[in-house]
Amino acid sequence: MNQETALKIKQELSHVKLLVCTPCYGGQCYTGYLRSTVGLVQLLTQLGIEHEIYTLDSESLITRARNSMSARFIGDESFTHLLFIDADITYNPQTVLRLLMSKKQVCGACYPKKVLNWDK
């Protein structure tokens, strides 16, 4: 990312405080998720975007875990954005910036199935 683009993004997202939530049943996450999230933290830090990574490993039901994480977001009015990422997903940190810059109230992103059926 060049300096001009970084400055534009920094200005556009200066108000953002992002809570990244990942339910990690059994305290486990995939290495691809870890690499992606470390990259996201580096990118957000470089751009001066406030953020927090929140994992929950003590809940076996994903819906209940997400509800608990949503309560954390709602309970802290300093957060402006909530992002759920599953612990088995690899993603491009730049995609998170595009989602934040979309200015939509709710948005999502596609990701491939865990196994590709090459015969189809």
What are these regions (language model features)?
Residues L47, R72-D76, S102:
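Alpha-helix C-cap/termination motif
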Residues I62-G75:
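Short, conserved alpha-helix that lines the donor NDP-sugar binding/gating region
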Residues G39-Q42, A71, M101:
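Short, well-ordered alpha-helices that flank and scaffold nucleotide-derived cofactor binding pockets
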Residues N92-K120:
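Conserved catalytic core of nucleotide-sugar-dependent glycosyltransferases
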Residues Y25-G27, I89, K113-K114:
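Residue-level marker for beta-strand->alpha-helix junctions and adjacent short loops that shape enzyme
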Residues M1-S60, R64:
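N-proximal low-complexity "stem/linker" segments adjacent to membrane-targeting elements
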Residues E77-N92:
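Short beta-strand-to-loop acidic/aromatic patch adjacent to the donor-nucleotide binding site
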Residues V16-L18, F79-T80, K104:
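Local beta-strand N-terminus motif with an aromatic residue
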